[in-house]
Amino acid sequence: MHTPTLLRWAVVSAFLLCPTARAQVSLPGFELERLDVTLGRSSIVSGNGQLLVPGGMSVALAGQYQHLPLVLRNGERRLDLVRSRASALLAGSYGVLSWLELGIQLPVVLWQRGDDPSAVGLAPLASQGLGTPVLQARFGLLSQRAGQPVDLALDLAVGLPVGSSRALARDAGPRFQARATMGMPLGPLQSSLEAGVLLRSRNPLAPPSASGQALEVRLGALLATTGKQLRGELALRGAFAADASQPSIEVLAGGRMPLNPELELFALAGPGLGATPGTPIARVLLGVSFRREPPPRMEFLTEPVPRFRLEEAQTPKKEEVRPETVVPVPTRELMPSENPST
């Protein structure tokens, strides 16, 4: 009997009969984290299609808390397998070309707590462990800096299965993700949309399937205020997985506070809806980000430019207007002529 079937049999049997399990089975590992983190010039939870300029770099350190991200149910019986979970993330990105940005993410599960799973024949979970590292490449397609109406980028990422299986921080195999992100101004606000697909190993808690892979469609939207002071953010995220009976939806609201032109703090929190594993009923995200970009390069004209020579301006001389010549008249010619008759 393969592990997923044995797991479901153990859970259902324990909930119905409530025996004391003597042989404990380790829960097959899968990645419980569902939050997509974005890098560079965008929000930490949603991409906006912008890229770092060549030579620019961005580093972020974030910590988050999740409440009830994994709950097993069987009728009225319930097992809070992961009631509380805290994790940290170190992420960085670098602008290579005007159309290419590379990034890396290193997550870590700091601690997690839940009900004792030995009642259903499961071994306890590890409280700490390394998460799934992610390597990412972002390709710029459109840019408002180039005079185009929107910012548009394509993200390609791969998650490496090197994390801790007992901490529910890795899949059985690598995960691949493709995502398109777009951003544009919307009056006094900055809006962004994203849509992507994730190919990952099938969740062992899902019903059995002939395929060991599962496809997941992820959508997101964000509205943010602009300015140099405190900026507000409102994000909506949704996921529709082939191995889940209902979608996963999260709403996050918060803000970003610049400390100086390169350093800023961010904080977001909000509820989650859905019974998909990894969807908490509440999530809190705090962190700090650092971004430094060189000034944009001067662009030089490639076409030949005719040479010019500076010369003193020659102003036309005004012609002198000479008064008409006055011819003297003898005085006697001015006197009245004598009348010869007198």
Task: Tell where the protein language model's regions lie, with residue ranges.
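Cleavable N-terminal export/targeting peptides
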Residues: 1-28, 295-342
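Transmembrane beta-barrel domains of Gram-negative outer membranes and organellar outer membranes
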Residues: 23-307
